[in-house]
Amino acid sequence: LPDIQEPLFSNLHGEKTPCVIMAAYGNRHYDDTLAQMQYRLEEQGFICIGAIAPVIPHIYSDILGKGRPDEKDIRIIRKFAVEIKKRLETGEQYGFASVKVPGNPLPAPKQMKPVEKSFDRARCTKCQVCVQRCPVNAISQETLQIREDRCLNCMSCVKVCKAGARGYDCSQVADYLEKNYS
C-alpha cells in the first residue's frame, strides 16, 4: 500500500467488526496489499473474515488484464460472496475468525516511480471533477496542479477529465509490464 494511506485507515474504527478486504489488480501481482490491509484494519478493531484479489484491466496497459473479470472470475467472485454471507451468518452466532492472507503486513516502503503527467490548461474547463475524484487529494483545488509527493499514479484524474486536459505518459511502465507479465 502507498505510504499515504494513513488517513484512510486511521479514520476507520471497528469493535470486533467483521470486514472483507479486496485488492483488485491488473494481472501483475497484488504484492503484500491484502496482508497490509488486514494488519491495518485489525489494528483499528476489525476482523477480516474474507479476502479476495480479482484481476481487472491494468491501468497502464491495454493488454494486461484485458477482458477481466471474465465469466470464470465472476463465478469465483459470486462463490466468494456466498461464502462470506455464510461466514457472517455463523459468525454472529459463534464468533468471527480472522482469515490468513499471503504477504508481509509490514514490508519495507517502495519508491514510487514517477510517471510523466501532462496538464493542458487551455483545454481545462475548471470543472474540478479531477480534484473531487482524486483518491488521495493530490490535486490542488486552487492551481489544479498535482502534488507528486501524494500522487499514486492511478490515472483517476485522466479517466474523469471529459475535456481531455489531463494525460499520463505511462508507455515505459506499460512496456515493462507487458514484457514481464503478459
Model-inferred region functions:
Residues 24-27, 124, 151:
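Short, surface-exposed acidic/glycine-rich loop or hinge patches that mediate macromolecular interfaces
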Residues 178-182:
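Active-site-proximal loop/hinge segments that shape catalytic or ion-binding/gating pockets
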